[in-house]
Amino acid sequence: MGHTKNTGNQTPEDLQVNIPTRDFIRLHRNDDVRILAFSAGKNPEVDVPFALDQIKGWQTARHKLPLWASTEGIIYPPHLNMEQCSSEQTARYKQKVLASYYQGDDAADCACQSSHVKRTDKSVGEGAAWTVDGVLMDLTGGFGVDFSFLSRCFTKSVYVERNASLCRIARHNFGLMGLSNVEVVNSDGIDLLKELSADNTFLMTGVGSRLPLFIYLDPARRDVNGKKVYNIADCEPDVVSLVPLLLSMADKVMIKLSPMFDWREAVRELPGVSDVHIVSVRNECKELLVVLSGKPDELRKNGFRIHCVNDDDDFTFVFGGEETSLLGECQGSIDGSVLLVPNASVMKAGCFSELALRFGVSAISVNSHLFLSSHTLENFPGRQFCVVAVSSMNKKELKRNLAGITKANIAVRNFPMTVDALRKRLKIKDGGDIYIFATTVYNDSHVLIITKKIV
């Protein structure tokens, strides 16, 4: 994330790391930094604070940013910046979104014509297998993870960050990663954009045509005191007030928001929304991406797309501005059915009617957000379970249906007890291959649906 406080940064001003410090980092990068902090002071030539930052950074990157972790010589920023940066998986997803705009079905809707798109000899693993003869501007550079993937798609890319230390780190790392045609600017992104808006010759080609501009922002979601903010307008920079400027300059604008934000509020406050991407990794909602286009009136009329993404699953639908509530409830037997549990992105979107219509399934009840099918479904965005028994909360029924079950995974949906309270009442330990869903059915009865996982 751009615009973060860079507290505790121990990075040398010139990024030159002496040999003892470099060797110490390499030797101990798999060790516990808490223990190292007490034992590392034995060698006076080792820059211990810097070394510990690098070891912690690499340990985070090993899982979050494997490409970076495998690149020798990468300099990592303080822990806060590492926590806030995108993962490699979500950064690659943003790159995939770009592909849809500039070379996919959406290319006709973008100011970038096909003549601007060129094939390259890169593999998908290295980055984009194509480039746009255009400009990327990341106005809130931060550690530069998203920039490192998006910049591979453009012939020119500009990373803007007002923290001088992060700029030095970015310049160093981009060189190691083989990123060419990138410019690192130590400035406030919005101030720079305002300057360029007065004279946008930087987008003009030698023959007088205009290059497409793609702007990316990741506004800080904390105030000056470090407290989280919960309104889009309270983020820094305030993207709501900046929309006219952004759309006057760019053909497309991508804004990364907290997954805690309501996408409906984002659409209300940000004119020109063409796409909303709710991005989850391993069923945990990580990012809310909002893409703006320079045609707000047309988009309001025709609606926009909502992409519910979880790893390789992508459930996309067009939202016309009105919620549909045509959700049919199952009023028959649940036994023997397939229980469908939507993934985190679908849950965040709240698009349950669209889901039911697309797959022809019934809801257990309007507010339970669990669905039933007579068979397994291909490409369903979520998990699927075989229902082996259904029990009321009657003691005798519970005893009969739970006989022999000592361990189970328990979830509650629209149910008057917490997981812990229910587990205590049922006297069942956590784990095993049984999944119990406690919920409320169409007639307001509380039931336990006992299942085994299929997908």
Predicted regions and their residues:
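SAM-dependent transferase fold signal centered on methyltransferase-like domains
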Residues: M1-V455
